[in-house]
Amino acid sequence: MENVLGFVALAAGLIIGLGAIGACIGIGIMGSKYLEASARQPELMNALQTKMFLLAGLIDAAFLIGVGIAMMFAFANPFQL
């Protein structure tokens, strides 16, 4: 029983940690490409900014769904015997 709880805690930590790393890298790459595109074509800055913020929200939402799943594993453990 203790092994299962330990593995669940490890899995929850990995879900949150790796999800955060992936979201941060994704938003960072997207932000750099937005700045690059805005420097090349300044007249498209407003349209690109809207799309960038929409995609940043979707990336962040995927991370928060992972946090919710990890919290479900941690507090409402479906693997109890």
Swiss-Prot record:
Site (Reversibly protonated during proton transport): D60
Keyword Metal-binding applies: no
GO annotation, cellular component aspect: plasma membrane; proton-transporting ATP synthase complex; proton-transporting two-sector ATPase complex, proton-transporting domain
Alphabetical list of PROSITE patterns matching this protein: ATPASE_C
Keywords carried by this UniProt record: ATP synthesis, Cell inner membrane, Cell membrane, CF(0), Hydrogen ion transport, Ion transport, Lipid-binding, Membrane, Transmembrane, Transmembrane helix, Transport
Function (record text): F(1)F(0) ATP synthase produces ATP from ADP in the presence of a proton or sodium gradient. F-type ATPases consist of two structural domains, F(1) containing the extramembraneous catalytic core and F(0) containing the membrane proton channel, linked together by a central stalk and a peripheral stalk. During catalysis, ATP synthesis in the catalytic domain of F(1) is coupled via a rotary mechanism of the central stalk subunits to proton translocation.
Subunit architecture: F-type ATPases have 2 components, F(1) - the catalytic core - and F(0) - the membrane proton channel. F(1) has five subunits: alpha(3), beta(3), gamma(1), delta(1), epsilon(1). F(0) has three main subunits: a(1), b(2) and c(10-14). The alpha and beta chains form an alternating ring which encloses part of the gamma chain. F(1) is attached to F(0) by a central stalk formed by the gamma and epsilon chains, while a peripheral stalk is formed by the delta and b chains.
Family: Belongs to the ATPase C chain family.
Name this protein carries in UniProt: ATP synthase subunit c
